[in-house]
Amino acid sequence: MSTIEERVKKIIIEQLGVKEDDVKSAASFVDDLGADSLDTVELVMALEEEFDTEIPDEEAEKITTVQAAIDYILSHQE
């Protein structure tokens, strides 16, 4: 079983079409990984599906880096 961190990074790689080496914890989806607003919405949707959770819009807006996504999922797992 993959760790949450590995699963989040895999989704980011698939959704944004970036290299694994580029997906560092501090990487910003927009500034470092070239995501646009649609990419970030699709990324949040993919995270919701993978982890069977719902991320409210106000929370989704705060998820701007790889680590923020990992932290959110970790803190909202049952």
Curated annotation (Swiss-Prot):
4'-phosphopantetheine is transferred from CoA to a specific serine of apo-ACP by AcpS. This modification is essential for activity because fatty acids are bound in thioester linkage to the sulfhydryl of the prosthetic group. Keywords: Cytoplasm, Fatty acid biosynthesis, Fatty acid metabolism, Lipid biosynthesis, Lipid metabolism, Phosphopantetheine, Phosphoprotein. One of its GO terms (cellular component) is membrane. It is found in: Cytoplasm. Pathway: Lipid metabolism; fatty acid biosynthesis. GO terms for molecular function: acyl binding; acyl carrier activity. InterPro entries: ACP, ACP-like_sf, PP-bd_ACP, Ppantetheine_attach_site. The keyword Phosphoprotein applies. Pfam families: PP-binding. The modification O-(pantetheine 4'-phosphoryl)serine is found at residue 37. GO terms for biological process: lipid A biosynthetic process. PROSITE patterns: CARRIER, PHOSPHOPANTETHEINE. Residues 2-77 form the Carrier domain. Belongs to the acyl carrier protein (ACP) family. Carrier of the growing fatty acid chain in fatty acid biosynthesis. NCBIfam families: acyl_carrier, PRK00982.1-2, PRK00982.1-3, PRK00982.1-4, PRK00982.1-5. This is Acyl carrier protein. It comes from Tolumonas auensis (strain DSM 9187 / NBRC 110442 / TA 4). The gene is acpP.
